[in-house]
């Protein structure tokens, strides 16, 4: 129910009848002694108690899987499984290189890589469904250990045609033209391509627009690939990790736009729960720190 969103969807996922799901849910509520769901329109919604219960269940299931893998690794250290999650850009551009080197050193180790936005990656790590995560700066209150960091930049990009218009707008302002001339008025007239809610890049974009004091129209696009393609064909401009568009910038399919306040300097963090690392995860951390991409974390800011 917590993941599927309805009795019907849960029944379809479990390949059982809706009556069986409803009966199991009723039995669970009797067992814990409180309602875990409440009516919501034509469906059901978790109560606050249900949300808390579901969070613990996620964590327990993750720990059970972690225990199974730890036992398997102890029995056969070379055949353990590495479980890692990464925000989309890091999963596409950074983690594959790390996993390639790790697999060369440990060819019999299994690998599970989960990709998602910042909120999804945090949930996977907190619920012990993965052992490591690559994400942006941990939010205050997130009890997590930083094992390594890697610098990266967020830049504004668009099609070469839009970038040329941006330079023309900046040049007109420099020449003393008034009215709608200038970079900021031009930027405010462009559609901005945003990732989905829960994305760290979206939050950075919203903060940048607030700093620039502009309120342009926006389009929500759900993946880096779709963002790149949309920007390349001129649908709008976007703030994106330079890692995600390195090939397009090199080929000229996209162009960087010199927006005031950019590039934004950020870091990728290799994170883990504050528990002893399973052997495969510890081996990846050692491999990462031996690479040129990541460094040991500095003192807290």
What are these regions (language model features)?
Residues 1-17:
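Short helix-boundary/capping micro-motifs
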Residues 29-46:
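A short LG(V/I)-centered, amphipathic sequence patch enriched
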Residues 31-32, 53-75:
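Alpha-helical linker/hinge and terminal dimerization helices associated
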Residues 79-142:
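Central regulatory/effector-binding core of bacterial HTH transcription factors
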Residues 117-118, 129, 198, 203-257:
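Hydrophobic hinge/microswitch elements
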Residues 142-148, 152, 226-275, 283:
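Beta-alpha-beta core module
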Residues 144-193, 197:
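Flexible hinge/capping segments at coil-to-helix
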Residues 179-184, 188-212, 278-282, 286, ...:
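Secondary-structure junction motif
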């Amino acid at each position: 129910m917590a993941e599927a969103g309805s009795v019907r969807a849960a029944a379809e996922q479990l390949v059982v009848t809706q009556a069986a799901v409803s009966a199991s849910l009723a039995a669970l509520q009797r067992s814990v002694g409180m309602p875990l769901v409440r009516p919501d329109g034509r469906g059901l919604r978790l109560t606050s108690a249900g949300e808390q219960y579901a969070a613990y269940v996620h964590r327990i299931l993750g720990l059970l899987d972690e225990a199974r893998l730890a036992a398997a690794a102890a029995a056969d250290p070379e055949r353990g499984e590495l479980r890692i999650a990464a925000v989309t850009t890091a999963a596409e551009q950074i983690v594959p290189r790390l996993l390639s080197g790790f697999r060369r050193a440990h060819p019999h180790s299994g690998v599970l890589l989960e990709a998602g936005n910042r909120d999804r990656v945090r949930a996977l790590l907190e619920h012990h469904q993965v052992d490591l995560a690559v994400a942006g700066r941990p939010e205050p209150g997130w009890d997590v250990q930083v094992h390594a960091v890697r610098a990266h930049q967020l830049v504004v990009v668009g099609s070469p045609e839009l970038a040329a218009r941006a330079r023309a707008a900046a040049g007109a302002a420099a020449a003393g033209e008034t009215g709608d001339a200038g970079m900021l008025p031009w930027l405010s007239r462009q559609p901005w391509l945003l990732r989905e809610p829960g994305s760290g890049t979206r939050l950075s974009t919203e903060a940048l627009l607030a700093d620039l004091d502009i309120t342009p129209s926006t389009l929500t696009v759900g993946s880096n690939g779709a963002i790149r393609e949309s920007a390349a064909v001129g649908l709008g401009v976007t703030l994106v990790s330079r890692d995600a568009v390195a090939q397009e910038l090199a080929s000229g399919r996209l162009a960087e736009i010199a927006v005031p306040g950019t590039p934004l300097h950020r870091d990728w963090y290799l994170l883990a729960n504050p528990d002893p690392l399973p052997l495969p995860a510890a081996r990846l951390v050692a491999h990462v720190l031996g690479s040129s991409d990541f460094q040991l974390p500095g003192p807290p800011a």
